[in-house]
Amino acid sequence: MALCLKQVFAKDKTFRPRKRFEPGTQRFELYKKAQASLKSGLDLRSVVRLPPGESIDDWIAVHVVDFFNRINLIYGTMAEHCSESSCPVMAGGPRYEYRWQDERQYRRPAKLSAPRYMALLMDWIEGLINDEDVFPTRVGVPFPKNFQQVCTKILTRLFRVFVHVYIHHFDSILSMGAEAHVNTCYKHFYYFIQEFSLVDQRELEPLREMTERICH
């Protein structure tokens, strides 16, 4: 029998500290609206649509932070099964290998272990979310012109976490009775990125068959 989400994903398993929205802000109200829709049992395709009169950048920002929290929690639960020895390369099966590149330590694409890649990824996303120039939280402060491009890069890299977890650690998901919860999170993520064309279709190829099966 599948366990409830709180039982499956213990809070102390979070890979990085959970990001929260400031109460009283527009972003917080949007987050509450999105969560209420999720809990209402509405079709996930409907849940991700931009509410009338709302800013698309605010809507995307709320979801990027929420997906970061959720995927961070999923990977944190799997992390003990994802080691330097078990996953020496960040990959999605034999056909897909993901290399890390940033503006600091790895200026050229680097072949890294999955846990090292994940640690760098979560640090990188956390830095962007905490950067007021990228994710402004003050009323009246506009988003940067390249905001959606930044979010595309974040979401593309988060999708790779799903790829690695599904292909290399699905047995762990099953053993915890977490399949339904991870699938729901994936479907929510997938419908969102499709709704706003935020991830290149080629990036989705590793999970195409599974996606066609569960996101029909």
Swiss-Prot record:
Using the record, list the residue span of the signal peptide; answer none if the entry has no such feature: none
Q: Which GO terms describe its molecular function?
A: metal ion binding
Q: Where is Zn(2+) bound in this sequence? A: C82, C87, H164, H169
Q: Does the keyword Protein biosynthesis apply?
A: no
Sorted keywords for this record are: Metal-binding, Zinc
* Keyword Metal-binding recorded: yes
Q: Which InterPro entries match?
A: MOB_kinase_act_fam (IPR005301), MOB_kinase_act_sf (IPR036703)
Stretches of the chain forming a coiled coil according to its record: none
Tell me the SUPFAM superfamilies matching this sequence. Answer: Mob1/phocein (SSF101152)
The family annotation for this protein states: Belongs to the MOB1/phocein family.
The protein's role, per its UniProt record:
May regulate the activity of kinases.
Name of the protein in its database record: MOB kinase activator 3C
Species of origin: Mus musculus (Mouse)
